[in-house]
Amino acid sequence: MLIRTLTLILVFLFSSSLYAQIPKAPEKKEGEGQFAQLIIRGVTLINGNGAPPIGPVDIVIEKNRIVQVASAGSPHMPPGKNRPKLKEGGKELNCEGMYALPGFVDMHGHIGGTGQGTPAEYVFKLWMAHGITTIRDPSAGNGLDWTLDEKKLSAENKITAPRILAYTAFGAGAKQPITTPELAIEWVRENAKKGADGIKFFGAAPDIMDAAIRENKKLGLRSCAHHA
């Protein structure tokens, strides 16, 4: 019983503490887009399912979605004639001799705090430069509201950043240690109302963790855990 109580207290203290918040990413002032249509011309595609590269192809993007991948002919041959046509207000990129592949998803990407010594702008741009287009921030260490604000700005294309998924540390923001399954369910429901994408668990008594995970799944949210 003593071990269980100490564990609950430690989890509560850890999850209630946050990194000191770092400066948010500034409004985007450089770069182009979004465009009504973007066509990546003549690229060799690695589609990420283990199949060999294919190409050249034209990749057509509209409203932030890939709507068509069309053959652009044969390698080392003149381009085909029936290629997708660019719409008014669109943008073409000549990518012959280059490769394209899906953006990477970083499933454990802490945006960090002041101890890291870098602002959010640097972290976001570093991820983007390495091809990471979606990150999951387990614990949302700068606070859930802070992380959700950056998520919204990224989705609106107002900052240069990957897509962001915010996973709250289990028990974060609770008014008291979560010592019963009922308190766990109550916290999970409140976390969902706040707009979190999921929960990160650091450990809890089996009945409490079971209740939290089941309620979280029922609400359509996801979860992850710190296993070490």
Please provide the spans of the model-predicted regions.
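Bacterial N-terminal signal peptides that target proteins for export
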Residues: 1-7
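Histidine-rich, glycine-flanked metal-binding segment
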Residues: 22-33, 45, 51-101
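Bacterial N-terminal signal peptides
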Residues: 7-17
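Catalytic Zn2+-binding segment of zinc metalloproteases
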Residues: 115
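Divalent-metal coordination cores built from histidine and acidic residues
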Residues: 26, 34, 95-107, 119-228
